[in-house]
Amino acid sequence: WKGDDPALIMNDTSWLLEDYQRGGSVKTFVKHIEEGLKIAVEDKSSLLVFSGGQTRRQSWKTEAESYYHLALTMSKGLPFFSDSQEDPSQSRLPFEPLDKSETARASRYMSTNEHFDLGRLRMTTEDYALDSFQNFLFSIARFYEFTGTYPQKITVVSYEFKKRRFVDLHAHALRWPSNKLIPGGTQRLNYVGIDDEPNSPSIPKLHDSAYDLFEVDMYGCYGRLLEKRRKRNSGRRVPPYSSTAPELAGLVDWCPAINSRLRGLYPGWLPWDPRASTGLGRGAQVILEQNGGKFVKAEYLPDGKRIV
């Protein structure tokens, strides 16, 4: 979104669009934002992350910043921290707030309510992702930057036609435990898919052309996927997450051999592995499963020799 008059949000001319997105995609983008806001407002423990880098040469803003800005201009409810919740921004302010006059002037310019306390919002931006895999991975890293912990569950709001790509490929590449449940019975990965309306001119062109590419190149390291990232990174931004989310450094930089498919799955430890919650590694988990959930007890003589 260009950030023009909020009254013209639904006009294609207010957006930087690809040709195939004209005539219907704008309404879908707005629905995605509305759905994200709705989920975040209902789940008081959630953080809404708008993800997307500076992919357009005609704009100085990132995709995520434009969505965040648009969310502020909408009349929908916004996800605020409750009074009983700690606001992370209060403990690590990077700079002093602007004085009142500057804040008011900036607020009017941005078409937002000058009384908003943005530091109390449970939503943020992830400004480096250049494709859907990075949307997934970098949003987790940004969640850690903002909260100091990793998410227990993730809800992705995107196009329905991209669902298989996220659920079958990206989650697998991240080894995210999609089918596991958190206390309360909620799955750790949920997907809300919203496509353009059936009569939209863009519908015939909405198909997942990237699925086959990610199926072969799960981390987007080669060929057309790498070329697309380079083309989209006109701002020449470098994501900081190897430093700011250090447990993910290996995964962020991981590139297996070309055409390795599943054989190239990232082998290192990840914060959502069983070890993180149980204290047990994969080998110990296997032993437990083989022995009915119990470790075999070895018996020792007084001199320390084991009875075999």
Identify the role of each PLM range:
Residues 194, 198-308:
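C-terminal accessory extensions appended to soluble enzyme cores
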Residues 1-220, 288-294, 299-302, 307-308:
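A structural signal for short, hydrophobic/glycine-enriched beta-strand patches
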